[in-house]
């Protein structure tokens, strides 16, 4: 094992995560229909600051992400600062790492803390699948640019006459990889076939996710980390994730048809995470700054790792690559973990990563490591359910996982937890957290 890389400031301070909060997550076109991601971000940051009772001017940086970006608000981070009453001098910039976006936001704030340029910051992300940047065809876009430069009405009419009816149709956001044309569901199908993951195994994992998430809500475990929101017309409160199917049965999952490979596939809408709206954020600061403000941290960021692999095959194996690196940098092994939380983009992807984490052959032949990362103990894995149940507002999921894991570690008396996610483009992320 290589030498551990401690995440501390020049003064030896650990990176503390003092608070975390999210909105409830809503299925597309339901509770947050018509509310853009920037407004969801404002909601959660405003409430996070109010609950923490930290002076707004104590926050020196805000790093926020949005995967499905809106042209009218390209820097969501700065809009959140300006729209929440924070000090206008607060540094703010936006990041995007697909489904691992808020992992990246947390890492960026942590790096600023370690560099000594700030002492406290906010990291998070928001996405809306209900408010989308509907575009125009390339032909229409080109004509519109040329029309803007045309000098006469005749020139403008000539340009418009070149268009066909199909050129006027709206163009929804792409769901396929730009470089390959493959949808993430196509890759999930490929991984299911490559690693021998059955439909029954996928449905069982999805069922487990919903049951555990429903139980977590029923036992009140999520109440402290999920805010109550009010959407127009501001009459009905929305305070719990609305995708969780606690009353479903395994037989219900078996009824759905494959969503990607219609003839021979096993990936369905039920064993995949749905399109979702929501936002999440965490407050990070140096350990000494937390003490100055009289705050007890939820926990600490022990290490993190980002990886990238080929996109043509096994694109969603990011956790199998990033997990051993994050553990190594933390000076830990799989056996040292109290909790292991993996983003469930698809049940097939999740099960493939779990399989390869315990594979000596994968470790040796692919990762170039002497031994497997380690089998994931089922009693430690996604103990409160995962993204299949909660939903997946792309940029918010990482912050949800971090906050949820730290709260659960505290309930268990402390220890180490690892959170990890795959992301589009063959990217992966993992973070080791510590709670006392």
Curated annotation (Swiss-Prot):
Its EC number is 2.3.1.16. GO terms for molecular function: acetyl-CoA C-acyltransferase activity. One of its GO terms (biological process) is fatty acid beta-oxidation. InterPro entries: Ac-CoA_C-AcTrfase_FadI (IPR012806), Thiolase (IPR002155), Thiolase-like (IPR016039), Thiolase_acyl_enz_int_AS (IPR020615), Thiolase_AS (IPR020610), Thiolase_C (IPR020617), Thiolase_CS (IPR020613), Thiolase_N (IPR020616). The active site is at residues 99, 392, 422. GO terms for cellular component: cytosol. It holds the Pfam family Thiolase_N. It catalyses: an acyl-CoA + acetyl-CoA = a 3-oxoacyl-CoA + CoA. Pathway: Lipid metabolism; fatty acid beta-oxidation. It is found in: Cytoplasm. Keywords: Acyltransferase, Cytoplasm, Fatty acid metabolism, Lipid degradation, Lipid metabolism, Transferase. Catalyzes the final step of fatty acid oxidation in which acetyl-CoA is released and the CoA ester of a fatty acid two carbons shorter is formed. HAMAP family: FadI. Belongs to the thiolase-like superfamily. Thiolase family. Heterotetramer of two alpha chains (FadJ) and two beta chains (FadI). This is 3-ketoacyl-CoA thiolase. It comes from Salmonella arizonae (strain ATCC BAA-731 / CDC346-86 / RSK2980). The lineage of its organism: Bacteria, Pseudomonadati, Pseudomonadota, Gammaproteobacteria, Enterobacterales.
């Amino acid at each position: 094992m290589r030498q551990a890389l401690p995440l501390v400031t020049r003064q030896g301070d650990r990176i503390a995560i003092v608070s975390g909060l999210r909105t409830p997550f809503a299925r597309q076109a339901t509770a947050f229909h018509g509310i853009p991601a920037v407004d969801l971000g404002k909601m959660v940051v405003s409430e996070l600051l109010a609950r923490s009772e930290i002076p707004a001017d104590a926050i020196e940086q805000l790093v926020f992400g949005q995967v499905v970006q809106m042209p009218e608000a390209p820097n969501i981070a700065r809009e959140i600062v300006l729209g929440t009453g924070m000090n206008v001098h607060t540094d703010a910039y936006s990041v995007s790492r697909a489904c691992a976006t808020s992992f990246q936001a947390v890492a960026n704030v942590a790096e600023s803390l370690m560099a000594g340029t700030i002492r406290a910051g906010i990291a998070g992300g928001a996405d809306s699948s209900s408010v989308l940047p509907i575009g125009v065809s390339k032909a229409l876009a080109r004509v519109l640019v040329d029309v803007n430069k045309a000098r006469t009405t005749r020139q403008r009419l000539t340009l418009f006459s070149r268009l066909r009816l199909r050129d006027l149709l709206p163009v929804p956001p792409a769901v396929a990889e730009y470089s390959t044309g493959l949808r993430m569901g196509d890759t999930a199908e490929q991984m299911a076939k490559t690693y021998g993951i059955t439909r029954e195994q996928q449905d069982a994992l999805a069922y487990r996710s919903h049951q555990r998430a429903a139980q977590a809500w029923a036992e009140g475990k999520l109440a402290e980390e999920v805010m109550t929101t009010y959407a127009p017309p501001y009459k009905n409160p929305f305070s719990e994730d609305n995708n969780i199917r606690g009353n479903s049965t395994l037989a219900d999952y078996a009824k759905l048809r494959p969503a990607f490979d219609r003839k021979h596939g096993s990936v369905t809408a039920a064993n995949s995470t749905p399109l979702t709206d929501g936002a999440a954020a965490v407050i990070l600061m140096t350990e000494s700054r937390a003490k100055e403000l009289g705050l007890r941290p939820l926990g600490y960021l022990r290490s993190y790792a980002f990886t990238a692999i080929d996109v043509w095959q096994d694109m969603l194996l990011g956790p199998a690559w990033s997990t051993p690196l994050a553990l190594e940098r933390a000076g830990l092994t799989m056996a040292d973990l109290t909790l292991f939380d993996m983003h469930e983009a698809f049940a097939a992807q999740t099960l493939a990563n779990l399989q390869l984490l315990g594979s000596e052959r994968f470790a040796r032949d692919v990762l170039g490591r002497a031994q497997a990362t380690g089998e994931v103990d089922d009693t430690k894995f996604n103990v409160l359910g995962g993204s299949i149940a909660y939903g997946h507002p792309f940029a918010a999921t990482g912050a949800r996982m971090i906050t949820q894991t730290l709260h659960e570690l505290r309930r268990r008396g402390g220890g180490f937890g690892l959170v990890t996610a795959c992301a589009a483009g063959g990217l992966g992320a993992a973070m080791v957290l510590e709670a006392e």
